[in-house]
């Protein structure tokens, strides 16, 4: 049976594992270092099989050997962002976690595609790529799928349309410098830039940029996990099924948009093995300047890694 492993059984990891097993295209292994947590959550999820009708199995474990032969490994492990904590402050702790996770995952699944969710995700995706030694196409991070989902929600509310009518385009860092591309964000096929004023577009963009922090402020003791897990599940499905679907993801760039040796959110075509193609949009001068500025923010984080 094909297998997908989820590393980390916190809110994002466990909800993702649930979403994946309900899609019923592969067995799911949920791994965590805390004994009992992945086992208990997996058992709970498995007891919904007769209700929902999925046939594949979900297993919880503390042993990386259980992940052997995974086609895709999703890395959610890391500490959650707390109120007032920046993504950069997560870096030192999550770098140590990522180093251990990548080593163990590839020991048992050397052919796996890595999907990185841990924050700060652009930098963690870069770190996973460097640690793994894998081709850049086999390492991808959560970015614009989530940010775009947030944007689509606010655009839909503003214009009174269904969120599914919005095709968002959010590029750059998954963080404060992310860039909403209004010309390439479509609402029923029409550019957002033609439907709202520049001021309104900026207002919607700021709401999307602050979407994660807004949730953290409400929750007090945690961060978002429903929309993030849904976003990652969509990415995993596109990779596993080889759909060729275009999504905005954190990808290793090698000349695209004039950038090299960096991970940044850009449109990519996902399929078997990870990224099949990086889509280069015809950005105008202002759009490109904003993307380059966002890249500079990520470069600062990457430079602080201990490699």
UniProtKB/Swiss-Prot annotation:
Positions that bind NAD(+): 8-13, 32, 94, 117-119
Enzyme class: oxidoreductase
Keyword terms of this UniProt record: NAD, Oxidoreductase, Tricarboxylic acid cycle
Pfam families: Ldh_1_C, Ldh_1_N
Highest taxon listed in the record's lineage: Bacteria
Reactions accelerated catalytically: (S)-malate + NAD(+) = oxaloacetate + NADH + H(+)
PANTHER family: L-2-HYDROXYCARBOXYLATE DEHYDROGENASE (NAD(P)(+)), L-LACTATE DEHYDROGENASE
NCBIfam families assigned: MalateDH_bact, PRK06223.1
Protein name per UniProt: Malate dehydrogenase
Recorded name of the encoding gene: mdh
């Amino acid at each position: 049976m094909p297998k997908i492993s989820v590393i980390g059984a916190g809110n994002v990891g466990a909800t993702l594992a649930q979403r994946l097993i309900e899609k019923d295209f592969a067995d799911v292994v949920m791994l965590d270092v805390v004994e009992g947590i992945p086992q208990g959550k997996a058992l709970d999820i498995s007891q919904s099989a007769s209700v929902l009708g999925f046939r594949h199995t979900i297993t919880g474990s503390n042993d990386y050997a259980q992940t052997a032969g995974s086609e895709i490994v999703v890395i959610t492990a890391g500490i959650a962002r707390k109120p007032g904590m920046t993504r950069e402050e997560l870096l030192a702790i999550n770098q140590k976690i990522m180093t251990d996770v990548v080593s163990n995952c590839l020991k048992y699944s050397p052919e796996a595609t890595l999907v990185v969710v841990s924050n700060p995700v652009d930098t963690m995706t870069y770190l996973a790529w460097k640690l793994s030694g894998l081709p850049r196409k086999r390492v991808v991070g959560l970015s614009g799928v989530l940010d775009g989902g947030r944007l689509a929600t606010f655009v839909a509310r503003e214009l009174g349309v269904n969120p599914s009518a919005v095709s968002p385009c959010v590029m750059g860092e998954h963080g404060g410098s992310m860039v909403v591309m209004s010309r390439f964000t479509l609402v029923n096929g029409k550019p957002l830039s033609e439907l709202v004023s520049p001021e309104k577009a900026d207002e919607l963009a700021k709401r999307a940029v602050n979407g994660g922090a807004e949730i953290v402020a409400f929750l007090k003791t945690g961060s978002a996990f429903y929309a993030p897990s849904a976003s990652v599940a969509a990415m995993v499905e596109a990779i596993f099924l080889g759909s060729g679907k275009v999504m905005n993801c954190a990808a290793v760039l090698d000349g695209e948009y004039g950038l090299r040796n960096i991970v940044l959110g850009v449109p990519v075509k996902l399929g078997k093995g990870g990224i099949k193609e990086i889509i280069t949009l015809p950005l105008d001068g202002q759009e490109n300047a904003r993307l380059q500025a966002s890249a500079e923010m990520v470069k600062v984080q990457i430079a602080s890694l201990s490699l």
